[in-house]
């Protein structure tokens, strides 16, 4: 399970060091893709394969499903962390997430998110109220 908040630096070559506690779970390969809110999502390969299969099972006659699958496939990059636990983020991914040297990696239970540190802080400030007022209906009855 991926939990917590970490603040690695992005180096000049576009490499980001993944938190040490997640390296074993990601050692078999990982998939980096564009996510919502102009962040990046990092999935273990097996988890991403399940997501991709579900997306591919949607009706191809539905334009939204087709567009989602097309964008998901085109925006995904397979990575294998190096001996120091670093992955190289593509220029396209860095541009999409507007990443500076200061990044934030957050655990999102079954995947990781990579954010620019300033954008993550802004997101937290804008959505703080949502956390404390989340309704049971929107969270599928977990409370």
From Swiss-Prot:
GO biological process assignments: negative regulation of DNA-templated transcription initiation
SUPFAM superfamilies listed in its UniProt record: AbrB/MazE/MraZ-like
CDD domains according to UniProt: MraZ_C, MraZ_N
Any one GO molecular function term: DNA-binding transcription factor activity
Residues covered by the SpoVT-AbrB domain: 5-47, 76-119
Domain of life per record: Bacteria
Pfam families noted in UniProt: MraZ
Record's keyword terms, sorted: Cytoplasm, DNA-binding, Repeat, Transcription, Transcription regulation
Coiled coil: none
Any GO CC annotation of this UniProt entry: nucleoid
Family classification: Belongs to the MraZ family.
HAMAP family in the cross-refs: MraZ (MF_01008)
Assembly behavior: Forms oligomers.
This protein's name: Transcriptional regulator MraZ
């Amino acid at each position: 399970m991926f939990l917590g908040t970490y603040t690695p630096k992005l180096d000049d070559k576009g490499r980001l060091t993944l938190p040490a506690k997640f390296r074993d779970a990601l050692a078999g390969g990982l998939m980096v893709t564009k996510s919502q809110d102009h962040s990046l999502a990092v999935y273990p390969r097996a988890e991403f394969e399940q997501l991709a299969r579900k997306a591919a099972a949607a009706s191809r006659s539905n334009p939204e499903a087709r567009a989602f699958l097309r964008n998901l496939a085109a925006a995904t990059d397979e990575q294998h962390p190096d001996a120091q636990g670093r992955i190289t983020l593509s220029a396209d991914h860095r541009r999409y997430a507007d990443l500076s040297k200061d990044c934030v990696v957050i655990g999102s239970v079954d995947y990781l998110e990579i954010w620019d540190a300033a954008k993550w802080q802004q997101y937290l400030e804008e959505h703080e109220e949502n956390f404390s007022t989340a309704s049971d209906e929107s969270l599928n009855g977990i409370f």
